[in-house]
Amino acid sequence: MPAPYKDRFAGKKVLVTGASQGIGEATALRFAEEGAQVALNGRKEDKLIAVREKLPKVSGGEHPIATGDISKEDDVKRLVAESIKAMGGLDVLVCNAGYQIPSPSEDIKLEDFEGVMAVNVTGVMLPCREVIRYWLENGIKGTIIVNSSVHQIIPKPHYLGYSASKGAVGNIVRTLALEYATRGIRVNAVAPGAIVTPINMSWIDDPEQYKAVSSHIPMKRPGESREIADAITFLAAEDSTYITGQTLYVDGGLTLYGDFENNWSS
C-alpha cells in the first residue's frame, strides 16, 4: 500500500528498535516512504541490511544500521549515540522490540520471566532515557511511540511475563508523558491485537488456531503489520500534536470482547 503522505516526515530523523522484521520493519518502511531517514536497530546486522534494501532513499542520507541489545545499557548508549551521529539528529524514537515465552504460570522459569522483562521493559526504559537526555540537552521537542499490546490491559494466560511487561509499559508511557509534557516531548503507545507477525507464528501456522483467533475478533480477521505502522506514524506526526500519555488500541475491536480467557488459553 502506498504511503498516504509522501513528504510528511521529510527531514525527520527516526530510530526504530526491533526493526529487522514484522511491525518494526513495516514501521521503518512507512517512515522512509514518507521522507524520514531511519536508523534501524536489531541484533543481527544481516537482517537489518536486508530491511534497509527495501527502504526508499531519502534526502537526509543513507538509513544507518544500529545493532545492539536494547536490554543492555552499554549497547543502548552506543546505538543511540551512533544513530544521532549518523543522521545528524533524532526527532522520533519508536520502541518496538518485543519478546515472549509461553508457559503455564506454575512452570515459568525465572530466567525466562526475567528475559521477557529485560527486553520488553528495560528495553523500553533505556532507549527512552538516552533519547530524552539528548532532547533535553539540545532543546528538542521529540516524540516517542512504544509498541505495547492489548495485553497491557487484558491478561494472557500462559504468558505471565509478557502480560506483566506490557502492563509496565503502559505506566512507563504515562509517567514519561507527564514528566516531560512541559518540555514539548510527547510519549504515546500503540497496543496491537492479533497481528500477522513472526512473533505470532504459533497460531498463524495452525489453521484451527488461526480460525479461532479470527472468529473472536469483531472485525473477523487479524491485523497486518502495516496497519500498526499506520498508527505509529500518526502518533509521530503533526496530526497528533495534542496527544500524549495515551495508548491507541489497534486491535480490530479485540479488547471489546469479554470471553478472552476461553479463546486465548492455548
Curated annotation (Swiss-Prot):
Keywords from the UniProt entry: NADP, Oxidoreductase
Keyword NADP found: yes
Record-listed substrate binding positions: S149
Entry EC number(s): 1.1.1.119
Catalytic activity: D-glucose + NADP(+) = D-glucono-1,5-lactone + NADPH + H(+)
Active site, UniProt feature: Y162 (proton acceptor)
Family: Belongs to the short-chain dehydrogenases/reductases (SDR) family.
Subunit structure: Homotetramer or homooctamer.
Protein name: Glucose 1-dehydrogenase
